[in-house]
């Protein structure tokens, strides 16, 4: 591994709240077609949402984005008995989100813009909300806070003492493909507020918003990277950012950019089209919260102009209070065909020694352990655990108390040459405890070349780690030795609870959600619910 890390300390790059409009014109993403009402409405109305301890709330289940479920209500020995319990079909095509499960309710976004609240046991529909454009984030559920009791004359206090204080509703927070963030009433599905965090035409919220202490932390990504090779596109002007929103109103409290300078005209390309810069450093993952140090961590993407900036291809720490940049560790990797950017969330983990480490994997296939107390200094890992020079860590890793589990996607640009693999690493040293190559069955939908890349986010529970593959198979591996415990091919057609024709396919982006004995996964336009023996 060739690596030239750079530590840069910079002052505040926060933007005042008044500089960010709350509700500007709608974004430019494709508007979904009108969807039919769901046919499987629950027989009874939903109760208010009670936020408990055993749940999967948001992207990583906890603030540290470990993607670890310590209380799955499934024993590792019963994982081979998992069977399909029910399926639900999304209207409007394939979906790439991840279910959130709180209080026996599943909350799910969709690429068609419909947001769902389903009963986790039966798959019936409590409510839907149709956003004007698609969403692919996980949903975070949180209480908006308790309203204050109005001033009451002393002589009436005893009379009214039995009355409960009226509480604000719990809310479901998510982002969409135009850079907007929403809050819905989690019980009823009605819109509470909408806030436009970024107005760039290519802005989108790819990383799930993270809720902490009455603030919603939102990272902003983009699809402008797709146009960098287009000579007719005036490239590039998008800058990545992270923002803090007030959960009660959606007001932007601060916003910090990952490219410090505003883009300016640079030159005209061979087609005579004006080009711009600097730009890039999009954030495609969910922020990780470090309450102890008062910061959040994000991983950034590459420069879209070919000129590296101080925060491109980096892990960066921003202050939770005001968005000031605390430190940044740039991790450019030379000699790799794939990007050195980060699209998966950093994982904050406590070692057996009591010290903490930031675990980060990038598209290059290189993984790192960084010291949160010393500006992201690289821990003494041999070769930085360069597990696979063919690439790459895509959407998310997982960590329990013993190991860090990293799935590698291989080169998606080479059909039939993407084997994929799952690695268990020592989070202290980066040494591999085991690794298992992805099995290579033929894909159900084709006899031709088939990718077995493992780009989907990983999920771990005691004794078992779940990793999906582009071949459509969801597999559970032993956390001890990496042996495959269970294998389910999702690339098939399913009978659904709501009567929508649903078919699975390649597994990508959002990973498995495990709560109360159930395993939930999205494949194609199907949401699949598994339990032991399908009961």
Label each region the model flagged.
Residues 4-14:
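Bacterial N-terminal signal peptides
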Residues 57, 63-69, 93-97, 116, ...:
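Short, solvent-exposed loop/turn elements at domain surfaces
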Residues 207-208:
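Extracytoplasmic mature domains of secreted/periplasmic and thylakoid-lumen proteins
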């Amino acid at each position: 591994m060739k690596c030239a890390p750079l530590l840069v300390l910079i002052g505040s790059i926060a933007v005042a709240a008044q500089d960010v409009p709350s509700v500007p014109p709608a974004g430019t993403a494709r508007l979904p077609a009108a969807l039919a009402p769901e046919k499987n409405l629950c027989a009874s109305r939903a109760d208010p949402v009670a936020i408990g301890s055993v749940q999967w709330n948001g992207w990583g289940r906890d603030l540290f984005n470990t993607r670890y479920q310590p209380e799955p209500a499934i024993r590792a020995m019963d994982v081979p008995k998992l069977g399909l319990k029910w399926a639900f079909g999304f209207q409007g095509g394939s979906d790439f989100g991840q279910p959130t499960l709180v209080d026996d309710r599943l909350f799910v976004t969709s690429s068609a813009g419909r947001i769902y609240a389903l009963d986790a046991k039966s798959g019936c529909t409590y409510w839907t909300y149709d956003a004007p454009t698609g969403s692919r984030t996980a949903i975070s559920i949180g209480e908006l806070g308790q309203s204050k009791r109005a001033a009451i004359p002393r002589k009436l206090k005893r009379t009214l003492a039995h009355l409960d204080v009226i509480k604000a509703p719990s809310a479901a927070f998510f982002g969409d493909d135009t850079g907007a963030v929403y809050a819905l009433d989690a019980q009823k599905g009605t819109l509470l507020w909408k806030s436009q965090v970024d107005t760039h035409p290519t802005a989108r919220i790819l990383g799930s918003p993270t809720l902490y202490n009455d603030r919603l932390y939102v990272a902003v990504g983009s699809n402008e990277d797709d146009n960098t090779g287009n000579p007719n596109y005036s490239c590039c002007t998008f800058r990545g950012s992270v923002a803090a929103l007030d959960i009660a109103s959606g007001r932007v409290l601060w916003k910090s950019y990952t490219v410090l300078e505003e883009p300016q005209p640079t030159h005209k390309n061979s087609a005579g089209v004006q080009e711009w810069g600097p730009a890039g450093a999009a954030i495609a993952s969910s922020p990780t919260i470090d309450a102890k140090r008062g910061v959040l961590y994000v991983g950034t993407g590459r420069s879209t102009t070919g000129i590296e900036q101080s925060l491109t291809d980096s892990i960066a720490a921003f202050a939770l209070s005001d968005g000031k940049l605390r430190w940044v560790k740039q991790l450019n990797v030379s000699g790799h065909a794939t990007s050195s950017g980060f699209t998966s969330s950093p994982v904050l983990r406590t070692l057996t020694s009591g010290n903490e480490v930031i675990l980060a994997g990038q598209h290059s296939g290189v993984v790192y352990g960084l010291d949160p107390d010393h500006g992201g200094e690289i821990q003494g890992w041999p070769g930085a655990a360069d597990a696979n020079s063919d690439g790459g860590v895509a959407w998310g890793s997982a960590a329990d108390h013993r190991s860090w589990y990293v799935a590698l996607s291989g080169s998606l640009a080479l059909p039939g040459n993407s084997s994929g693999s799952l690695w268990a690493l020592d989070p202290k040293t980066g040494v591999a405890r085991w690794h298992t190559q992805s099995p290579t069955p033929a894909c159900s939908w084709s006899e031709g070349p088939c990718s077995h890349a493992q780009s989907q986010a990983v999920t771990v529970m005691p004794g078992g780690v779940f990793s999906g593959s582009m071949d459509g198979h969801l597999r559970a591996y032993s956390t001890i030795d990496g042996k495959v415990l269970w294998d389910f091919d999702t690339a098939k057609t399913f009978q659904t609870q709501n009567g929508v024709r649903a078919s699975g396919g390649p597994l990508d982006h959002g990973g498995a959600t495990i709560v109360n004995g159930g395993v939930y996964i999205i494949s194609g336009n199907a949401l699949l619910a598994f339990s032991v023996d399908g009961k």
